[in-house]
Amino acid sequence: MISILMQTLKIATRQSPLALWQAEHIRDRLQALYPELKVELVKFVTQGDKILDTPLAKIGGKGLFVKELEAALLDGRADLAVHSMKDVPMHLPEGLSLAVICEREDPLDAFVSNHVMSFDQLPLGARVGTSSLRRKCQILKQRPDLEIIDLRGNVGTRLAKLDDGQYDAIVLASAGLKRLGLISRIRHSINAEISLPAVGQGALGLECRANDKKILDLIAPLAHQPTSACVRAERAFNAYLEGGCQVPIAGFATLTQECLTLEGRVGSVDGKTLLKDHVEGHADQAEVLGVQLAKQLLAQGAGELLRDLYQ
């Protein structure tokens, strides 16, 4: 530990305001633990940041937001990468480890509008902005009359498009708005019954080289075991379904003492079909529960829904 404290820890991050907030948050937590630690943020513009005129589902999904950061870890330009867990692909490059999952912020989706308080108050045919097929599916299940329009860009860009009148409402992650001090923009948090969160939503993950014991030891105190169990269950569910980050799959786990409850949904993009199920079990069985739930939804026809999407 002493040797790393005498060096500079390099954290890879995207340049968006939210990504920088997340990296700075981890930097501050580490420096509170290790006051002698020097930290440098190494900033990258990823492919996901560059390609803003095409829906994510058509250009490779949210993995485009992490590839450059992972390359920097592998070639030694960075020691640590901070990710929003909902952006992290199910399979990591060889040699890297998702070593720490930090305590979760609000996992729910947020309804944001300048005119109305909720979906119920939106007029027929109102325009709702989101880049998420998961949100689109669940919104259309409730309100098939709404026009769901793709919405890309960082949080500030998305809010500016709403303020310009391009949308009647937009849906964003509550966690991002809260982290950026924009809680006043949230009209209300959307109940999970209406919009079940994305796998990993609201949690931060720390990725590093799998064999770098100094870094692994350094970041270990930031791990939050209850969040880790929940996110591991969610990711196992998604991985078994072979779902990327841009498919109409929702997975959300909660923990009460040692009992883990995992809810999952798979739907069609048009919202006409939405399969739901849940499992419960001991937190030690997080991944097993994720696979069990995936199998239950596959038995309901989830595989056919996802195959239709990939074709």
Curated annotation (Swiss-Prot):
It catalyses: 4 porphobilinogen + H2O = hydroxymethylbilane + 4 NH4(+). Its EC number is 2.5.1.61. GO terms for cellular component: cytoplasm. Coiled coil: none annotated. Keywords: Porphyrin biosynthesis, Transferase. Binds 1 dipyrromethane group covalently. Pfam families: Porphobil_deam (PF01379), Porphobil_deamC (PF03900). Gene3D superfamilies: Periplasmic binding protein-like II, Porphobilinogen deaminase, C-terminal domain. InterPro entries: HemC (IPR000860), Porphobilin_deaminase_cofac_BS (IPR022419), Porphobilin_deaminase_N (IPR022417), Porphobilinogen_deaminase_C (IPR022418), Porphobilinogen_deaminase_C_sf (IPR036803). Its cofactor is dipyrromethane. Pathway: Porphyrin-containing compound metabolism; protoporphyrin-IX biosynthesis; coproporphyrinogen-III from 5-aminolevulinate: step 2/4. The modification S-(dipyrrolylmethanemethyl)cysteine is found at residue 245. GO terms for biological process: protoporphyrinogen IX biosynthetic process. GO terms for molecular function: hydroxymethylbilane synthase activity. Belongs to the HMBS family. Monomer. The porphobilinogen subunits are added to the dipyrromethane group. HAMAP family: Porphobil_deam. Tetrapolymerization of the monopyrrole PBG into the hydroxymethylbilane pre-uroporphyrinogen in several discrete steps. This is Porphobilinogen deaminase. It comes from Acinetobacter baylyi (strain ATCC 33305 / BD413 / ADP1). The gene is hemC.
